[in-house]
């Protein structure tokens, strides 16, 4: 494989996606530290706001580091040694509460919204969000290309990463050492990956800070949609 900005030639074929990965891989790999993970989290969520799958852009770079951290901690666990915190573990904060951007609080608020549009989207988003699937919310609300909702979508990432970091440093939660790759309801994968019950409840605790970030922006957006829906109903009458 040879690369010339930003196209990669792989097996004789041009591959734009591989070119983008190659361009981003070097700077992203340097950022695997605690401050660097904050930058990567914000970067990935910002890409989502512009319609680019930010998680998948950074994931190929971080995945080998995640697997290395899991393998090393599995060895520590087998030897009865203390588990080691690796900054790459903070990446899970990107999607701990309902998928990338931690949108489950937004779906829960929407279930009782005065806006018919928000309520309709929330009804089809809440259960998938519990499983970490938030495409219905991201595309249906929508969050992408929506300045009001993009702000909390990005802001909650560093906040939750900070909470995670404090949780790891205080020992309330422990690093994962068992790889769990399937989608599961909140708390299930966290328990199975650590066999630690406090990890299982941690993401539910994170609903509080993420909800505090989402709520004021939710109310602003709700007010706008309620006004539009009222105007549309008046015009139809």
What name fits each language-model region?
Residues 1-5:
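Short, small-residue-biased leader/transition segments that mark boundaries at the very start
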Residues 30, 34, 38, 87, ...:
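Hydrophobic, aromatic-rich alpha-helical transmembrane segments
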Residues 116-121, 226, 230:
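Juxtamembrane helix-loop transition segments at the membrane interface in multi-pass membrane proteins
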Residues 71-84, 105-107, 138-237:
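Transmembrane alpha-helical segments and their short flanking loops
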Residues 59, 63, 90-95, 124-128, ...:
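Alpha-helical transmembrane segments of multi-pass membrane proteins, especially transporters
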Residues 6-113:
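Generic multipass alpha-helical transmembrane bundles of integral membrane proteins
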């Amino acid at each position: 494989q040879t690369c010339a900005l930003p196209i990669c030639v792989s097996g004789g074929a041009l591959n734009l996606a591989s070119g983008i990965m190659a361009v981003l891989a070097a700077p992203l790999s340097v950022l695997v530290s605690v401050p660097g993970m904050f930058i990567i989290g914000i970067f990935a969520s910002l890409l989502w706001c512009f319609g680019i799958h930010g998680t998948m852009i950074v994931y190929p770079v971080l995945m080998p580091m995640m697997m290395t951290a899991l393998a090393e901690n599995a060895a520590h666990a087998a030897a009865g040694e203390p588990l080691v915190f690796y900054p790459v573990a903070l990446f899970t904060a990107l999607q701990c509460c309902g998928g990338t951007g931690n949108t489950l609080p937004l779906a829960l608020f929407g279930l009782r919204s005065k806006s018919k549009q928000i309520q309709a989207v929330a009804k089809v988003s809440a259960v998938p969000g519990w499983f970490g699937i938030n495409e219905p919310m991201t595309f249906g609300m929508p969050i992408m290309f929506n300045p009001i909702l993009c702000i909390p979508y990005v802001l909650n990432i560093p906040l939750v990463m900070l909470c995670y970091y404090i949780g790891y440093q205080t020992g309330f939660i422990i690093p994962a050492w068992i790889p769990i790759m399937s989608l599961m309801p909140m708390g299930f994968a966290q328990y199975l990956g650590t066999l630690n019950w406090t990890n299982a409840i941690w993401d539910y605790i994170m609903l509080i800070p993420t909800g505090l970030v989402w709520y004021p922006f939710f109310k602003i957006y709700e007010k706008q949609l309620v006004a539009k829906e009222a105007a549309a109903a008046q015009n139809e009458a």
